[in-house]
């Protein structure tokens, strides 16, 4: 993660953010945050308001953020959703409701709130059920002909041109996210995860002290597992795409 970008993004989203809040948001010590603020002042990403003493994001800071601007989002919605049987016999899993709201629509609205409107939904099973979203939210649909036999890597393969050279969210249609976690700017590739106690057949992650994923394996116990949204930076996608082509 680019720490200068995270500092600039924090002031872009909340000009009144405090150093203590920054430390909490970035999971850093106050001392590290203080040093980063000093670096951002030297680079002219921030300036100090002479009247209030507050830090202000500068034009140079906004210019620095542009490299991290999110270009769009891809939502995978092609699968049958066997875990939701019998609900998915007639309704795709992403169109199931939680608290009276369809899961995929909630994510689309959260993306819109973050200023992200270039959204493509990868469809397969009962693909016609998603067509109403085109008019309602101006999304695009892309058909994955291998949805019944292959996994999400095949989905990324069919959508690879949407990721090539772009900063993109990769979401799954059947996630319900309480708080909006999307941003106009993302300062590095990431994959969200949850901790699972006991045995699991999910994709289990190993990471170093800096939170960088070092390995992935199918199945494990008492482990962090791949679960939920991901963000693929253009640099990450440019390395990933040749591996799946």
Label each residue range with its predicted role.
Residues 177-245:
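Conserved core of the sugar-phosphate nucleotidyltransferase
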Residues 1-3, 18, 51-68:
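Short, cationic-aromatic polyanion-contact patches
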Residues 31:
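Key DNA-contact positions within bacterial/archaeal DNA-binding proteins
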Residues 1-25:
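Short amphipathic alpha-helical interface segments
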Residues 41-51:
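A short, conserved structural fragment
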Residues 9-12, 60-127:
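N-terminal glycine-rich phosphate-binding loop and ensuing alpha1 helix
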Residues 128-204:
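Conserved beta-loop-beta/alpha segment of the NTase-like Rossmann-fold superfamily
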């Amino acid at each position: 993660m680019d720490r200068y970008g995270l500092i600039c993004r924090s002031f872009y989203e909340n000009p009144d953010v405090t150093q203590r809040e920054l430390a909490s948001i970035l999971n850093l010590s106050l001392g590290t945050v203080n040093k980063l603020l000093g670096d951002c002042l030297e680079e002219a990403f921030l300036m100090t308001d002479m009247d209030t003493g507050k830090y202000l994001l500068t034009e140079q800071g906004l210019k620095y953020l542009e490299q991290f601007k999110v270009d769009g989002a891809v939502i995978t919605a092609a699968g049958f959703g066997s875990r939701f049987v019998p609900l998915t016999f007639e309704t795709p899993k992403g169109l199931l409701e939680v608290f009276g709201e369809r899961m995929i629509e909630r994510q689309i609205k959260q993306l819109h709130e973050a200023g992200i409107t270039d959204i493509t939904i990868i469809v397969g099973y009962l693909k016609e059920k998603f067509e109403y979203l085109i008019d309602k939210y101006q999304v695009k649909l892309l058909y994955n002909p291998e949805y019944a036999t292959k996994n999400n890597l095949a989905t990324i393969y069919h959508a690879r041109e949407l990721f090539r050279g772009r900063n993109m969210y990769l979401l799954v249609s059947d996630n319900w996210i309480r708080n909006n976690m999307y941003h106009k700017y993302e300062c590095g590739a990431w994959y969200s995860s949850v901790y699972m106690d006991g045995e699991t057949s999910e994709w289990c992650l190993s990471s170093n002290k800096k939170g960088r994923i070092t390995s992935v394996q199918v199945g494990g116990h008492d482990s962090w597992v791949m679960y939920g949204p991901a963000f693929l930076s253009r640099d990450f996608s440019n390395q990933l795409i040749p591996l799946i082509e």
